[in-house]
Amino acid sequence: MSFVNVAPQLVSTAAADAARIGSAINTANTAAAATTQVLAAAQDEVSTAIAALFGSHGQHYQAISAQVAAYQQRFVLALSQAGSTYAVAEAASATPLQNVLDAINAPVQSLTGRPLIGDGANGIDGTGQAGGNGGWLWGNGGNGGSGAPGQAGGAGGAAGLIGNGGAGGAGGQGLPFEAGANGGAGGAGGWLFGNGGAGGNGGIGGAGTNLAIGGHGGNGGNAGLIGAGGTGGAGGTGGGEPSAGASGGNGGNGGNGGLLIGNSGDGGAAGNGAGISQNGPASGFGGNGGHAGTTGLIGNGGNGGAGGAGGDVSADFGGVGFGGQGGNGGAGGLLYGNGGAGGNGGAAGSPGSVTAFGGNGGSGGSGGNGGNALIGNAGAGGSAGAGGNGASAGTAGGSGGDGGKGGNGGSVGLIGNGGNGGNGGAGSLFNGAPGFGGPGGSGGASLLGPPGLAGTNGADG
C-alpha cells in the first residue's frame, strides 16, 4: 500500500505559480494578434500568398492558445480548490484528535497535577518558576525559568515514562552584599527512556563584600533506565568590591546515566574568583569543578568540570586567589564503558607589586581524578593549575605559588587501558622564594591491559 503526503500550503503556492503561467500565455496571445492582419508587401500573387500564410498562422495560433488558456484556467481552479479542501480536511481532522486528547488529559491533570500525554510548561524567566512535569506516559519536562536578581533558577520539570527532563534555569545575579543565586537542577529523564536535563548556571556574585561568592551551578538531571545524565551547570563568577574579591561558585555535578544504558553527565565548570583593583586583603578563589555523575550497567563516565581561576590583583598589594580544584571524572559502566577524564585545576591569579614587600603568588588547583572502568579504558587525570607569580618589590619580592597536584588516572578492573595521571602544575617565581612544582598524578592500573602513565611533575619556579 502506498501513501501520499499533501501539504496544503505547497498546493496553494503551486496554484499561484500556475496562474502566473496563464498570464504569460495571455500576453503571448495579445502579441500574436498583430500577425493575423498582415498586409501584402506588393500587388503581386507571391506577396499576397505570403501575407495570407502569416495571417492564417496567427489565427491558428490564437485558436490553439485560447484552448490552452481555457485548460490552464480550469487547472488553476482545480488546484486552488484542492488546496482549500486539503486545508479544511487537515483542520477538521486535527480538532477531533485534540478534543480526544483533552478529554483524556483532563481527569488525569485534575487528579495528579500533570497530564497523561504532553510536554510540561516552561517556567517564566525572571521568576525562578520551576518547569512543569511532562506527561505520565509521554512528554518532556519544561525548562525552569531564570531567577530574578538574588533568586535561584527554577528546577527543570521531570519526564514521565518516556521523555527528556527540562533544563534548570539560570540563577540571578547577586544583590548588593549578597552571593549570586544558584542555578536550578535539571529535571529527571523518563523512567523508561530519556535524558536528564542540564543544570542551570549560577549567577554572578553581588558587589560590596568579599562574601558575595558566585552562585553554584545546578546539578544535571538523572536518567531512568535508558538515557544520558544531564550536564552540570557552570558556577558563577565571584563578586565583591575593589579591595576584596569574592570566590567563584562551584560547578554543578553531572547527572547519573541510565541504570541499563547511558552515559553519565559531565560536571559543570567552576566560576572564577573576582580580582581586586585597590589595596586590600585578597582576591577571590576559583570555585571547584563539578564531579561527573555515576554510570549504570553500560555507558561512559562523564568528564569532571574544570576548576575556576583565582582572581588577579592589579593594586599595589593584596593576596592572590588560589585556583579551584577540578572535578572527578565518572566511572565507566559496571559491565562496559570508558571512565571519564578528570577536570583541570584552575590557575592562580596574578599579583600586583608594592614598594616594600611583594605579595605571595597563589597555589594552582589540583586536577580531578579519572574514572575507573571494568571493561574499557579508564579516564585520564586532570592537569593541575600553575601557581601564581610572586609580586615584585623594592625590598623583598613575594614567594611564588606552588603548582597543584595532577589527578590520578583511573584503574581498569578487567580489560582496557589504565588512565594516565595528570601533569602537575608549575611553580612560579618573581623576586622572592620560588614556588614548588606540583607532583604528577599516578597512572591507573589494569588487569589485562597496559597501565596508565604517571603524570609529569610540574617544574619548580
Swiss-Prot record:
Gene3D superfamilies per record: HP0062-like domain
GO molecular function, one term: oxidoreductase activity
This protein's UniProt keywords: Cell membrane, Cell wall, Host mitochondrion, Membrane, Oxidoreductase, Secreted, Virulence
Activation/inhibition comment: Oxidoreductase activity is inhibited by the first line anti-tubercular drug isoniazid (INH).
EC class (word): oxidoreductase
EC number: 1.2.1.n2
Region (Disordered): 232-251, 426-461
Compartment(s) of residence: Cell membrane; Secreted, Cell wall; Host mitochondrion
InterPro entries per record: PE-PGRS_N (IPR000084), PGRS_rpt (IPR048996)
Pfam families (UniProt xref): PE, PGRS
Catalysed reaction, written as an equation: hexadecanal + NADP(+) + CoA = hexadecanoyl-CoA + NADPH + H(+)
Gene Ontology, cellular component aspect: extracellular region; host cell mitochondrion; plasma membrane
Family from the record: Belongs to the mycobacterial PE family. PGRS subfamily.
Further information: Was identified as a drug target. Docking and molecular dynamics (MD) simulation studies suggest that PE_PGRS45 could be targeted by drugs used in treatment of other diseases: Entacapone and Tolcapone, which are used in Parkinson's treatment, and Verapamil, used in treatment of hypertension.
Annotated protein name in UniProt: PE-PGRS family protein PE_PGRS45
